[in-house]
Structures are given as C-alpha cells and as structure tokens.
C-alpha cells in the first residue's frame, strides 16, 4: 500500500508469517456431546472414561485445532502456573516447524519443563565456578579456544535459524549447548572466558526462554542492557572437514 502511494505511513514489516495451529484430541460422551480434556481420564492411554462416571466410555475423536466449540482447549493460566511460561514457550516452539500444526501433549510439556530444570542445574554449576566454589586452573590454554569456538559457532547457528523462523531447530541448538557445557564444565578454565561466553549464551536463549535467561543474568550481576552477541568470524572457520567416502555403497 505504501509503495502504491495509498498511505503516507510506511509499513513496519516486509511480510506476514502465518504460523500453524495448536491442536489437541477431541472427546465426546455416549450422547455425542463434546467433553473438555479435564473431564476425561485414562489409566492406560488407550481407553478413556468420564471422570464423573468411570463406567461411561469416552469416544476419542480426531486431533483438531483447539476451539471452544469442541472443548479441546487447554487453560493457559493453569499450565503456566504448573510448568512456567518458559516451559510452555519452549514446548510450542520445539515440537515442529512454525508453519506446521503443533499437537499438544502433556508428555511434551513435561519434557520441556525438565529440560529447563537441567539448564538451571547447569547454571548453578557455572555460577559456582565463577564464585570460586569449584576450583579450576584459571589460565588460558587450548580449552579456552575450544570454548570460544563452540560458543561463536552455536550463536551463528541460532542467529541464522532465527532469521529463517526455524524455531524448532533453535531448540535443538539449545540441547547442543546443554550437552557441550554440561560435559565440559569440569574442564573449564579461565573464568573470564567462561563468564563472557556464558553470558552470550544466555543472550541467545532469551528470545525463547526469556524469564530463565533474565534470572540467570541477574544472578551473574549483569544489569546493563544486553545486546545480541557479535560473532568472531575467526572461530567460524573449520581447520578440519570430515568427508565420507563410499566405495560400492560402503563407507570407507
């Protein structure tokens, strides 16, 4: 419209990204009335019954986008109170590409909650190192460069995936971060490098799990306005590249 001179105000965005819907199973009683998930119970995940009448079997319908008319909705306030807002955000963004529908599941919600608990345990361990509660050899060596390289490369991955709306891939990147940092914490050296890299990691976590990231930054006494970390391009270069060779269909 702005380019066609229909409006004087320039539009703030180049385009609209339409995300998929959040879906849930549908349930009906024997009289064909819709039932809310809270009205349904199951002991084996296969057979469902009404909570107020365990003798009445529930008809499980197809998975459809959440709607009040079909009563297949989840109360956001209840879920947030139980698991926290960050867990909900993490689950919704991790399940599938944003243009695809997301199937709501209690198991997926619990998995996201547990992952944030693991990140919190990792944070406490790193904080203990920075506070001298865990002794390390505080000097620069090849481990410092490995830490710098991993952190810069993962930040670049997350930056690229954010620009492409690949939120589910970003969550996979978060698991890479956890696996690396939890494995390498016992080998960490040079506290300045640890703190600088970890703060940058918290910055790239913040779009997805902002409350967790902000709490961790607060505990590290980072009170200034945080900015998206700049990548040092020298760490993006690979000295070694693994090439798979196949001869007659077999890897050599």
Indicate where each model-derived feature is located.
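Conserved phosphate-binding loops in nucleotide/dinucleotide-binding enzymes
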Residues: 27-85, 99-110, 234-236
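Short, conserved secondary-structure transition motifs
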Residues: 18-28, 206
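Helix-rich, typically C-terminal accessory recognition domains appended to large enzymatic cores
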Residues: 3-13, 78-252
């Amino acid at each position: 419209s702005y380019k066609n001179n229909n409006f004087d105000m320039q539009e703030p965005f180049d385009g609209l990204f339409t995300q998929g819907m959040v879906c849930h199973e549908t349930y009906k009683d024997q009289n064909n009335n819709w039932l809310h998930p809270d009205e349904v119970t199951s002991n084996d995940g296969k057979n469902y019954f009404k909570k107020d009448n365990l003798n009445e079997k529930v008809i499980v319908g197809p998975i459809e986008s959440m709607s009040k008319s079909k009563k297949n909705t989840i109360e956001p306030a209840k879920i947030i109170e139980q698991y926290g807002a960050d867990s909900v955000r993490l689950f919704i963004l991790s399940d599938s590409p944003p243009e695809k529908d997301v199937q709501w599941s209690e198991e997926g919600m619990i998995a996201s909650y547990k992952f944030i608990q693991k990140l919190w345990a990792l944070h406490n361990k790193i904080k203990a190192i920075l506070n001298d509660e865990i002794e390390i050899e505080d000097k620069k060596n090849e481990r410092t460069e490995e830490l710098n390289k991993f952190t810069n490369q993962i930040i670049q991955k997350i930056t690229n995936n954010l620009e492409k709306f690949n939120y589910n891939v970003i969550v996979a990147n978060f698991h890479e971060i956890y696996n690396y940092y939890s494995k390498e914490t016992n080998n960490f050296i040079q506290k300045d490098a640890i703190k600088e890299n970890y703060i940058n990691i918290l910055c790239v976590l913040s779009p997805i799990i902002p409350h967790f990231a902000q709490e961790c930054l607060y505990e590290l006494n980072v009170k200034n306005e945080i900015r998206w970390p700049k990548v040092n391009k020298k760490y993006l270069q690979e000295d070694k590249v693994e090439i798979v060779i196949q001869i007659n269909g077999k890897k050599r």
